[in-house]
UniProtKB/Swiss-Prot annotation:
Keywords: Membrane, Mitochondrion, Mitochondrion inner membrane, Repeat, Transmembrane, Transmembrane helix, Transport. Pfam families: Mito_carr (PF00153). PANTHER family: RE38146P. The gene is oac1. The chain crosses the membrane at residues 26-47, 91-111, 129-145, 197-217, 233-253, 285-306. This is Mitochondrial oxaloacetate transport protein. Solcar repeats lie at residues 21-114, 126-218, 227-313. It catalyses: a dicarboxylate(in) + sulfate(out) = a dicarboxylate(out) + sulfate(in); (2S)-2-isopropylmalate(in) + sulfate(out) = (2S)-2-isopropylmalate(out) + sulfate(in); (2R,3S)-3-isopropylmalate(in) + sulfate(out) = (2R,3S)-3-isopropylmalate(out) + sulfate(in); malonate(in) + sulfate(out) = malonate(out) + sulfate(in). It is found in: Mitochondrion inner membrane. It is a multi-pass membrane protein. One of its GO terms (molecular function) is thiosulfate transmembrane transporter activity. One of its GO terms (cellular component) is mitochondrion.
Amino acid sequence: MSEKQTIKALPAHNPTQVKKLGPVSGFLSGGLAACGAVTLTNPFEVIKTRFQLQGQLTKLDPSKRIYKSVGQAFSLIARHEGIRGLQRGLGTAYVYQICLNGCRLGFYEPIRRTLNTWFLDDPKGNKLAINVASGAGSGLCGALFGSPFFLVKTRMQSYSPKFPVGQQYGYKHIFNAFSRIIKENGVKGLFVGADAAILRTVSGSSVQLPIYNWAKRMIEHYNLLEEGMIKHLTASAVSGFGVCCTMQIFDTVMTRMYNQKNKELYKNPIDCILKTIRSEGFFALYKGFGAHLARIAPHTIFCLTFVEQTNKLFLKFQKD
C-alpha cells in the first residue's frame, strides 16, 4: 500500500472540531433558555391574546374597545388585576416552552445534520432549504407536544374578572384545566386547535433559526460587530422581527380557535380566516401585532441569547 493510500485510510483528526450537544442535552438547554425568556415577556402575551379576541366577528367601534394600545392595555391590566393579571398562565407557559422550544431549539441541529448527511453527504452543510425544513420539523414536534399546554395558557390569559374578552373559563390551575377539559370533551378536547397551532409553530420555527444564523453570518461577513453578547442580541432581534411577520395571521387564528368552546365559531383554521375577514376585514388577522412584536422580539432575543449560554453550560457538563 502506498504512502498516499495509507494517509487516506487514516481517520481525519480535527482538534478544533466543535462539539455538538446531543438531543437530550439540546432539549434541556433549549427549554431552560425559553423559560428564562418567557418570564420576562409573558405580560405581552397576555395583552396580545386579549387584543386578538377583542371584537371577535363584529364591527367594533374603536371608541368602545377596552384595550386600545399596548401601553394602555398594560396599564389597565396592572391597575385592575395586578402582577397576577399580567402573568396569567405563566406556570403553564413554562411547561409549554419546555415542550415547544425544547424541541425547536434542541432538535433543530440534529435534524439539520441528519438532512445534510442524507442529501449533501456533509453534516456541516449549510443550505437554506435544509435549514428551513429543519426548523419546520423541529417546530412540528414542539407543536404536537405543546398544544394542550398552549390551549390552557390561552384560556387562562383571556380570563379577566374586570374586562373579559372572548370565552371565559376561569381555570384555577393547569390540573384543574386538564380535568375540566377531559371531563367535558374527553382527551381529544386537549388537542382542540392543534391544527392551527401546527401552522403557527411550523411557520415561525421554519424561519427563526435560519434568520438568526443568516444574521450572524452577515455580521461576521461585513465585520460589523465583534463576537459577544451584542452580536447575539442583534441577530436575535432580526430573527424576532422575521418570526413575528411570518406567524402573525396563524397566531390570531390559533388564539381564537383555542378560546372557542366546542367549535361554536370556527370549524377549522381556514374557516376562521374566512369568517374573520368577512366580519372584521383582512387586517383583523393582524390584531395584536404590536403586542406580538413587543413579546416575540424580546422573547427571541432573550431565548437565543440565553441558549448560547446554556449550550456552553451543558457542553461543559457533557465534556466532564
